A protein has these predicted regions:
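Extended basic-aromatic, gly/pro-enriched interface segments that bind polyanionic ligands
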Residues: 65-142, 146-150, 154, 179-180
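Conserved AdoMet
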Residues: 1-37
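Conserved class I S-adenosyl-L-methionine
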Residues: 36-47, 68
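Core SAM-dependent methyltransferase catalytic element
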Residues: 140, 182-201
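A short glycine-rich, Lys/Arg-flanked "PGG" loop and its adjoining helix->strand segment in the class I
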Residues: 156-168
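Conserved SAM-binding loop of SAM-dependent methyltransferases across substrates and taxa
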Residues: 46-61
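Conserved beta-strand signature within the Rossmann-like core of class I S-adenosyl-L-methionine
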Residues: 168-176
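Short conserved AdoMet
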Residues: 34, 62, 85, 167
Length: 201
């Protein structure tokens, strides 16, 4: 498909601190590893989930965390790099968080990159393209509401690809609406923030 078509058909609805308990679960797991950690956010949409993790990492004194966000929608990647968000997008942040992490100009919230404790980068990528493997290995894959668009065969293919890029003891955190297939690659687990899948080695 042409890039213009991809940009039109992909759904990009999100906001900061969406499903906060799951975000906290991710951060607590990363902190427990007590070492540098690589996180993949696929799809990253307009960046709110990546930057939500980055804000929580800063507030919980997590160091050595790197986040890669990928999406097939170029407009969303551009928006991630612009770091400018609406009042609605930041409505779940408290006043102190808005003040600390954003500058407000013309009722738009400009994220202050220097306030984030971790490195965030974004790239145009289709999860079924081999360019996925250029990013190396990850400890956490954060993948919300992507599988809802795939049939069973594509879901299994996706889980196989995620397995290949996850480190030992790596985890996948899906969205609440995702129907994740059972495979030999992952074990389903439950936590306060919902469901996650741990890599079977």
């Amino acid at each position: 498909l042409k890039q213009e078509t991809m940009d039109f058909i992909t759904v990009c609805e999100t906001y900061f601190f969406r499903e906060l308990e799951q975000l906290k679960d991710v951060i607590f797991y990363i902190k427990s590893l007590d070492r540098p950690v690589n996180v993949l956010c696929a799809p990253c949409s307009s960046g709110e989930e990546v930057y939500s993790l980055a804000i929580l990492a800063s507030e919980n004194f997590v160091k050595g965390m790197n986040i890669v966000g990928i999406d097939i929608n170029k407009k969303m990647i551009d928006k991630c790099n612009e770091m400018i968000y609406s009042e609605r997008s930041v409505s779940r942040l408290n006043t102190m968080q808005k003040t600390r992490y954003f500058d407000v100009k013309d009722r738009m919230y400009h994220l202050k990159k220097e306030t984030l404790a971790c490195r965030c980068r974004f790239d145009l990528c289709n999860v079924f393209d081999d360019s996925l493997f250029k990013f190396g290995k990850f400890d956490v894959i954060f993948s919300r509401n992507m599988m809802i668009y795939f049939d069973q065969d594509f879901k299994i293919r996706l889980m196989e690809r995620f397995y290949r890029i996850l480190n030992k003891e790596g985890r996948i955190y899906p969205g609440k609406s995702d129907l994740v297939p059972e495979t030999a690659y992952f074990e389903k687990n439950f936590s306060a923030g919902g469901v996650y899948y741990s890599k079977v080695d």
